Every structure is written in C-alpha cells, then in structure tokens.
Regions:
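Beta-strand-rich binding/interaction modules
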Residues: 442-444, 752-753, 759-776, 850-854
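Beta-propeller blade termini and top-face loops
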Residues: 10-740, 747-750, 779-782, 790
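Mature extracytoplasmic or organellar-lumen-exposed domains after removal of signal/transit peptides
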Residues: 866, 897-997
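Short acidic/polar inter-strand loop motif in beta-rich domains
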Residues: 820-824, 856-864
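Low-complexity, Pro/Ser/Thr- and charge-rich linker/hinge segments at domain boundaries
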Residues: 702-728, 865-897
Length: 997
C-alpha cells in the first residue's frame, strides 16, 4: 500500500465534510472583547476552536480552523494593539470529560493567521494576561496535565510576544497555574493563583493537595509572595481553586472566588491583597467553585461585582449580597465574564451553552443558538428518510438533526431536542424511528414528546453502577433486541418493559490505582472493591450469539452463546483503567473485533487501537500512521469493503485501507476537534464531534474503491452511488435570511467522482437507457462569474458548474435535469438558498431508471452505470411520472423554439426598428394576460404562457391533472401554429433584406 499511502491525503482532498449542526452552543471557556472596536468579540469553545463576531454576537465566524487543536481554554487581546491576540489551548479545567491542548498561539493580524509559540507540554492553559501597555509582555497560567505530574506548569512570563517563556512561579509537578491577572493601574503588579488538583482515572474522582494558594508580585513577576492573611488554608479548610478579579477603578480592591471542602465562597481585599475577608456566605454565588472560578468588577463602579457560576450573579454593594443576573433552572454554567471597559453595559458571557452578548446591561442578550460548537458524545442514525442523526450533547441534552433539510439547507427547523439525557447515546429504534433510547436509560417518543425511565434498576444500589455514558446498542441481526450495560450487560425485547441480565459483573474485582495517581494513591476516601462499568458493547453482525463487552477499567469479555457464559479476552496490552472507549465487531468474520482504547486518564496521550482475528485469543496494536498525541476514541469497520477502517482521535478522522496496518488523515475540511464516535450509514460516513456537532462525508464509494493499481491509472471513473431524485428546496415561503445559521445539505443530484493522474480535458456525458445523451458537461464549458441578476443579489445564486481538468480526484454533480430550455425570462424561486439557488427554468426532471455515465479524458472513454431512484416519500406511479416527463419535454421544446424565434426577430428588428410586421410578430411583455385569457398571437406573450405552464408541471412529482393536460395540449397546438407562422414570416423577411455586397 506504499503508493496509496503516499498519495491518499492529497488524492481525496476534494471530498468534503458537511456540518449539519445542531446550532446550539457548547461549553465555551474563553472570551474577550475589543474595546476600541465595538461589536468585535472572540470566544474559544473547549473543543470548537476560536470564533469571532463583528456584530455583537448576531453571527460568529471560526478563525482557528486550520490549526492542529480545537481545545481552547484562554483568549487575551492586547489592549494597546488589538490585532495581537493570544490563545491558550487545553480546557483549563479539572473534570472527567475534557480535552487537552498543545500550548500557546499568537496572531498579529486580528486572527487571520496564527503562530504556535510553545508551552506544548502544559496541556491546559486556563488564563493569559497581557500587559495593557505592552502587547509583547504577557503572563500565562499553565495548569498542567490533568491526570499526572509534569514540570511544565505554573506561571510563565514572556517579554517578547511569546517567542520565549520563563517560568516565574512554580510550586511542584502536581501544582499548576489556575489564574493570573495584571493590575491595570500598575502593570508591574501581578496576582496569580496556583491549584493542586489531579483527576482520578475513574469517573468523578478528584484529588487535591496543599499546593493551592494565592500569590502577588510587585516587580513584574520576578519575585512572588504568598497572600494568606484571611484566606482559607488546605489543612484546615481544604483550599482548592481560586479565581481573581481586580476593580479597574480602584485596583487596591480585589475579589477572589475560593473553593474549600465546605463549598465555594467570595473573598474581598481592599489593601491590594495584603488581607482578605469573606464577604459573602451565599452558597449560590460561588457554587461548584472548582468548576467555575470567575469574578469580575465593573470598570467604573468598584461596588458592582459579577460572579460566574451555575448562574451569573450581580452585586451592587461590594459583594455582600447578590441577585441573579442571568441563568436558567437547569443551570447554564458560566465560565467567563468580559466587561467592556469603555461601555460597561456591554458584556460577553461564556458558558456551557455557548456565548452571549448584551449591550444594555443584561436586559437583553444575543442568542447562543447560532454557534455550531455542540459537544456530542455518540452518534446513531435512524431508518427514516431522510435519516436523522442523533446523539447526546454535553450540558444541553440530546438532539436529532435531519441529514437533509427540505429547504436546500439544514436550518433551525430541521433539528429538535430529544429528552433522553445530555450524556452519551441517543439510539433510534430501527423499526420505529420516532422512538429514541438514551441516557441511563430512557425511552422517548417523538409523537407524544414524552419520556419514560426504563432502567433495569430504577433506584441505583451498590450492585448496579452507571456513569454519565453507558452503551445502548441494538442487535444488528435482530432489530427487536436492545442491549444496555451498567457494570453488567442487560437485554430487552419489549422496549425496556422488562430486562434480562445476561452477564455477571464484568469489571475488575479489586480496586487498583494506576501509577499516574502517584502520591494521591492513599487519599481516596471511598476505596470500593469495584468502581468500573461496562463502557462499550458490540454485538456481532455475523453471529447473533456473539457479543463483546469492554469496561472503563480495562477489561474485555466475549460471549458466544448470547450471554449464558462469558470469557475474559482482555489483551495483554491493557492495564487497569485503560478505557475501552468503543468496541467494533467484525462485519466479515465473527472472530474479528477492534477496540479503541482511550488512555487519557492514565496520562498517556498515545493512540491505541487493538485488533483480534481469533475471537480475542490474541490482540495486535494497529496504530502506525496515527500521531503520537492522538488519543483514539472510536474505531469502525466499513460494512461493505473488507479492511476499510475509520477511527476518530482527539483531533481528526483517520482512514485505513489495510485493516488498520496503516492509517492516514481524513480530516479534509473539518476543523481539529475531538472525534467521539462515527458510523457508516449507507454510503455516508457520519461523525459526532465533541465540540463542533455532527458532520457527514457523503458517498464514500471512492474510499471503498481505491487500490494501488487504481492510483496509478491515467484516468478512473468511480462507481456512482444510487442517485435520489429529491427536490432541492420545497419551501414555498420567504427563505431564511443568509445570516441565520444553517448546516449543509447533500449535493443536489448524482455524485460523479473521477480521478486524473495528470491534467486533461474532461467531458462527462449522461446517457439514458436507450443510449441517448441526456446531458453533456465539459471542462471547457464557459462559466460566468456570479453577479447580481436583476433584483436577485449575487449571494443567493448557485455558481455554474463544470468538470475540473486538474490532476487529482474530483467530484462533479449532475442535478438530474435535462438541458434547460431557452427562455426570455429566467428567475429564482422565492424559496432561495444562500449561494445555492439555481436559475429557472431548469430542464425537465430525469425519470427514475437506469442511466450511464461516460467520462472522456486522457485519451480514454470510461462508462459506469448510474441508477436514479425516486424520492422514497413520493408514491406517484411510474406511468404518472412518464406522463409528466413527456408533457414537460414537449413544453420545454416548444418554449425553446419560441425563444429562439424571438431572438431571430429581435436581430432583424435591430436593422429594421420601424418594421410594423416584425413588431407585431414579436409582441411585447405588456401584452401578457393571465392564463385564463387568450393572449395576442405574438411570440413574447406566448413565451410567457409556455413558461408558466411548464413551471407548473415541473413544480411537483405528481402526474399532471386532466385539466393541466388539456391546457397543455391546446397550448402546444397553438404554439406550434404560431411558431410555424413566425418561421414563414421570418423566411419572407429575410428574403426582403437586401444583401450587403
């Protein structure tokens, strides 16, 4: 596969991932504004990259998508030069569901380009502070590895714009920097918070230590002193994370959110940190203080204070009392507050739901339903048409999104929440797509919008353990059988009304702490004998009795008798708490399986995929070609091509053509983000990202077909997938505005993929079943640049398409229409799609049936069969469609004939503008009458009449009504007579035209 391996990354570069939503914001940790440019704000989603708005949050644009990471924890804009922006990667949190980063980035052109600066091993950067007077002087809080000790943590300083960093505050390899702020009145005064915390490898486990504390430097960060007077300490209070805020109008006043074992509290200092007092005892104000550590002070009034927590709170009395400023019953979970120093009523909030802006002090806010930064856990697709893509979204609940919108795009109308819990799976019933199973475990019915808990054990007990994500899988051999797992495996055949436990506890028998827990090993207060769960299930599509189960504590079991007995087949490569993230049962051999192993919780960022071909007796690691820092979350096998595998890492999708022996990137146009799950749905590859919602790669036939020999050919035509005749846009109303968020629909027609070894002129022809050429496209076709067309602005118009003649793989789309007839007036539907509205009239729809694609290039002519099928929702008999097509063809031909006659008349009239006979023959647009009235026997009025009736016939996939048929037959007869008279008159007129000697 060497040749293919070298070329495939560029070979498939024209394939295109399309985002489909949901457009509901996800966890956003970083936020900053630009005081000198009102309306400009930047936010960083924890796995969604960096976004900018220039219109106060009305729309958001990604500006970091070409970078190698999407996990963002901090953004800082230099006040003295707002073109200078610093980004810290890694979430900067301590929680069981996070993604790490790779250091600090800088832009010096307002986000148009980026440079990686360093601190790669820090993994998590929660805060960056830039000197308000010097854009090259900055401090970076580096939290460090969430699951292990490391040296690159603490507070770092740079005086050269990040070209070099110096660690200026450090405690030990277990303590990191949590916050850093610069005194706006005196930039040599810097405050910083250190935090000693470690995530446990099991769910919801966290350790802490005595390293946490608050520090101050008065000499620009060279030396530091601890600030302890009046603050909690670790031994007495269990001191944890600290968040800092300075009053810009009185910089001696500071506020601190402080986490302790008793809860979170707000402290205030009025002497520049020398002494502190707990100013507020309201537990709501600093709730979950290890998750939310944000306090900000109004830039003008030092008594107005805001804290970000489950709710955002506001105080007007210096922090003594608070009222809710923004929040919701479920908890929006706010992380960042930015207040415009020049306009304090303008604020930016970043939360688990996305980012919102206010310009009136919180009276109203922009929406977070315009940010495609959803953190999806898993993905499943139902069997409806078009199919829906479903999964749980972190913090917001589960959602299902149409894979194809009815209006030429996927809008807010095309997705809906599904009440099956935010975490984990949302699995449609294969026999009833309106029923969804999800969470831990519930059943939701779309028709009634009601949800029922169907847990095997409604009230948890010591023998029944579940965490936030539990596997839910239907049997691929019996669509009535549903599997669910806790620490054991369960099966139901009646939709969860009753359950059968089909396994014993499959997790580790004895509590074990891996080496990365380190010095905290003896501090776990619980120390239960068992704390793992079954995290992955994979029923075999080859053998109904075979089921694989993997645990989050590093075990794999297999049953070959439907769960009566289980055999442990754990690979020797697995260590305790190596999480079996996904298991995939082989589609071609019952003894084959693949396991994606996530070892982030072992402080191991390396990729791990295991393969067995003998039922688990032996396993082989298959990761060649995967990047060293690419933790693997999922691996899947294509059900049609043996050896074609896909995997998802923390940054991208990868593909293997040789059963995992070698991997290469399939990122294409997708931004770097955590790939949590993927499935093959028919000919499509559907992906759940944990920061950018769902994505679909349409028609993976080229991936199924590629071989070494194929890559070496001068030209190759791939087998087209079955094309569905679907109306691109069935909206009959005003379109959604272009600035409304939208996902992409599949290509509008038949996808034709071809490969050129070298540049060559290309011709693509579509032939019907009788060998007649339906359409012909050439790389030499003339295409005009898109401009305004009459009253239609250019941003609505679909550009003309022609086949590419460049070397490489190309994707061309035939829109399933015959050639368009010439018409005096073209137009665009009121139901337009931004940048994708075709001009009308188009040619008649091609009938469902068998066609041939013929590609001529590089001196060769290649053919492939193409099947066109009707939209499965349309039940019109074939005879009705044929009647419609025949009548439409005749009307199109008559319209074309009429139009060309008008053009001839107009050319003659250019030379003879006063010729009354020619003027009468042409007629005018003013003479057009409604269809119920007979127009004058002239070409232009009849052109409008033909065009109107043609459009009516082509507007639906139904047989024409009898009255439409009668009207068409009459019109066609009259048009033929008029055209014949016109042709005769033109011939006479041409004879009268004197010849030029």
């Amino acid at each position: 596969m060497i040749f293919t391996l070298i070329l495939v990354a560029s070979l498939f570069s024209e394939l295109h991932w399309r985002p489909i939503g949901p457009f509901r914001g996800g966890r956003t940790k970083a936020a900053a504004g630009v005081p000198t440019s009102p309306g400009v704000f930047y936010v960083g989603a924890v796995n969604g990259g960096v976004w900018r708005t220039v219109d106060y949050g009305r729309t958001w644009t990604p500006i970091f998508d070409d970078q190698p990471t999407g996990s963002i924890g901090a953004i800082a804009v230099a006040l003295s030069n707002p073109d200078v922006i610093y980004v810290g990667s890694g979430e900067g949190l301590q929680r069981p569901d996070l993604s790490t980063g790779d250091g600090v980035y800088r832009s010096v052109d307002g986000g148009r380009s980026w440079k990686h600066l360093g601190l790669r091993e820090g993994q998590q950067i929660p805060q960056i502070a830039v000197d308000p007077k010097d854009p090259n002087r900055l401090f970076v809080a580096v939290l460090g590895h969430p699951y292990g000790p490391n040296e690159e943590r603490g507070i770092f300083r740079s005086i050269d714009g990040g070209e070099t960093f110096q660690r200026v505050l450090y405690k030990d390899a277990d303590t990191g920097g949590a916050d850093v702020v610069i005194d706006p009145a005196n930039p040599r005064v810097v405050y910083a918070a250190l935090w000693e915390a470690r995530q446990a490898p099991w769910e919801n486990g966290e350790f802490s230590g005595p390293g946490s504390g608050l520090y101050k430097s008065a000499d620009g960060g060279t030396t530091w002193k601890a600030l302890t007077r009046g603050l909690p300490d670790f031994e007495r209070d269990g001191l944890g994370r600290i968040g800092l805020g300075i009053a810009p109008s009185r910089s001696s006043r500071l506020f601190a959110t402080v986490a302790t074992k008793q809860g979170g509290f707000l402290y205030r200092s009025d002497d520049a940190g020398e002494s502190w007092a707990r100013i507020c005892d309201d537990p709501r104000v600093v709730e979950r203080a290890d998750d939310f550590a944000e306090v900000k002070v109004d830039p003008v009034n030092p008594d107005i204070v805001y804290t970000a927590s489950v709710v955002t709170w506001k105080s007007t009395d210096g922090g003594r009392s608070f009222t809710a400023f923004r929040g919701a019953p479920g908890g929006d979970d706010y992380h960042r507050i930015w207040i415009d120093p020049l306009r304090p009523a303008t604020m930016l909030l970043a939360s688990d739901q996305g980012a919102v802006v206010t310009v009136n002090g919180g009276a109203t806010w922009s929406s977070w339903y315009n940010q495609p930064t959803a953190q999806m856990f898993h993905v499943n697709a139902d069997n409806a048409f078009p199919y829906r893509v479903c999964g749980g979204q972190q913090e917001s609940g589960a959602a299902c999104v149409l894979s194809r919108g009815p209006e030429g795009a996927i809008t807010v109308r095309d997705w809906q929440p599904t009440a099956v819990e935010e975490y984990g799976y949302a699995v449609p019933d294969p026999l009833d797509p309106d029923v969804i199973y999800g969470g831990r475990i519930t059943r939701w019915d779309r028709r009634t919008r009601q949800v029922q808990d169907i847990s095997p054990v409604p009230l948890r007990n010591a023998g029944y353990r579940v965490i936030r994500t539990q596997p839910i899988v239907f049997s691929p051999t019996d669509p009535r059988t549903l599997f669910f797992a806790s620490n054991t495996v369960w099966k139901t055949r009646d939709g969860g009304r009753s359950w059968q436990q089909i396994s014993h506890d499959l997790t580790r028998r004895m509590w074990e702490a891996p080496a990365n827990v380190g010095k905290y090993r003896g501090t776990d207060p619980a120390r239960p004998e068992q704390r793992g769960v079954v995290y992955a299930l994979a029923p075999s599509p080859r053998d109904a009795a075979v089921l694989w189960a993997g645990t989050d504590d590093g075990l794999i079991h297999r049953t070959r008798d439907g769960g009566k007995t289980w055999q442990e087949v754990t690979p020797k490569q697995l260590v305790p708490w190596a999480k079996v993230s996904i298991l995939e049962a082989g589609h071609f051999e019952a003894g084959t399986a693949y396991a994606a192993i996530n070892t982030l919780r072992l402080d191991d960022l390396r990729p791990h995929i295991l393969r067995t071909r003998n039922g688990g007796s032996a396993w082989q690691e298959i990761v060649r070609g995967l990047p060293g820092g690419g933790i693997v979350n999922v691996v899947r096998e294509d059900p049609l091509r043996r050896g074609l595998l896909f995997c998802g890492t923390e940054q991208a999708v990868y593909v293997s053509f040789n059963d995992g022996d070698d991997w290469q990137p399939l990122r294409l146009n997708m931004p770097a983000t955590s790939i949590r799950d993927l499935v093959v749905k028919g000919d499509d590859l559907v992906v759940a990202t944990h920061g950018r919602g769902f994505w679909i790669l349409d028609d993976i036939q080229p991936l199924r077909e590629v071989t070494d020999a194929l890559v070496g050919l001068d030209v190759h035509l791939f087998a087209p997938q079955t094309a569905l005749r679907i109306r691109w846009n069935t909206n009959s109303d005003t379109p959604m505005p272009p600035d409304e968020p939208r996902g992409e629909d599949p290509p509008d027609g038949a996808i034709i993929d071809y490969l050129l070894k070298a540049g060559s002129e290309v011709t693509i022809e579509i032939l019907d079943g009788g060998g007649k050429v339906v359409r012909r496209f050439s790389s030499g076709d003339r295409t005009e640049p898109v401009t305004d067309d009459g009253i239609v602005p250019r941003w609505w118009i679909r550009p003309a398409r022609r086949p590419s003649s460049d070397a490489g793989l190309h994707r061309f789309v035939w829109d399933l229409h015959w050639p368009a007839p010439a018409a005096l007036e073209g137009g665009y539907s009121i139901a337009a799609v931004p940048r994708d509205t075709p001009k009308e009239p188009r040619g008649p729809w091609a009938l469902p049936g068998q066609y041939t694609v013929r590609l001529t290039a590089a001196g060769r002519s290649l053919t492939r069969p193409l099947t066109v099928r009707m939209d499965p929702r349309v039940k019109t008999p074939e005879a009705g469609l044929r009647q419609q097509f025949a009548l439409s063809q005749r009307l199109a031909e008559a319209l074309d004939r009429n139009t060309r006659l008008v053009e001839q008349v107009r050319r003659l009239r250019n030379d003879r503008p006063d010729d009354a006979a020619l003027a009468a023959l042409e007629g005018s647009a003013e003479e057009r009458k409604p269809l119920v009235e007979e127009p004058q026997p002239a070409l232009v009025p009849w052109n409008a009449r033909l065009g109107a009736l043609y459009s009516l016939l082509e507007s639906t996939d139904l047989a024409p009504t009898p009255q439409a048929v009668r009207a068409a037959e009459k019109l066609l007869q009259q048009s033929a007579e008029l055209s014949a008279r016109a042709e005769k008159a033109l011939a006479t007129q041409k004879q009268m035209t004197p010849r030029v000697p």
